[in-house]
Amino acid sequence: KYKVDRNDTLIAFGGGVIGDIVGFTASITLRGINFIQIPTTLLSQVDSAVGGKTGVNTKEGKNLIGTFYQPKLVISDVSLLKSLPKREILSGYAEIIKYGLIMDKRFLNWLLDNESKLMTFNKKYLIEAVFHSCKNKAIIVRKDEKEKNIRAILNLGHTFGHAIEAINNYQKSLTHGEAVSIGILMALDMSSLKGNSCLLYTSPSPRD
């Protein structure tokens, strides 16, 4: 109908679901055409728009249908976040904190020191948070793009989080970031019970 050819480019302008669907569509159209990500939520800017995971959800579960397919370009403009309710900012903040927990203690301490600035949409600090989140994720993805090994660390909180979303029938009463936040706490609790307690989590001061 639209006479698409391999020289065309799809643009994903929206949050994580839009990015996943457009990316998946690009990956299976004519065996792959270019696409560009322009994420408009904090969560998508720091996580889902980068890394190359695409897919569509089904009633059977999340991520059962999808591909690894990298965008040609990701444009993250934090000015687009101004219209978001605080709840959506907090949802994205969960993914940002994840990077601090799994690989970057200095970044985690910076987040704790500047939480109020991030929550009040300080552009300078939001840019810094988005940049370091994407940088940390890129380090992992370069080593293991298809998630056969170390990339699985980026799923901290997601195993439990996806189960929570499924139990909740993927209703908007619980955002993805909120489910991941709960999932991270559950994962850290399980780790502690198995004798692999996380110092950053169990210590009264994350800097100890």
Give, region by region, the residue ranges found by the protein language model:
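Oxyanion-binding "anion nests"
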Residues: 121-168
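A glycine/threonine-rich phosphate-anchoring loop and its flanking beta-alpha core
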Residues: 23-116
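Short alpha-helical scaffolding segments that buttress acidic/His motifs in well-ordered protein cores
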Residues: 93-97, 111, 129-137, 184
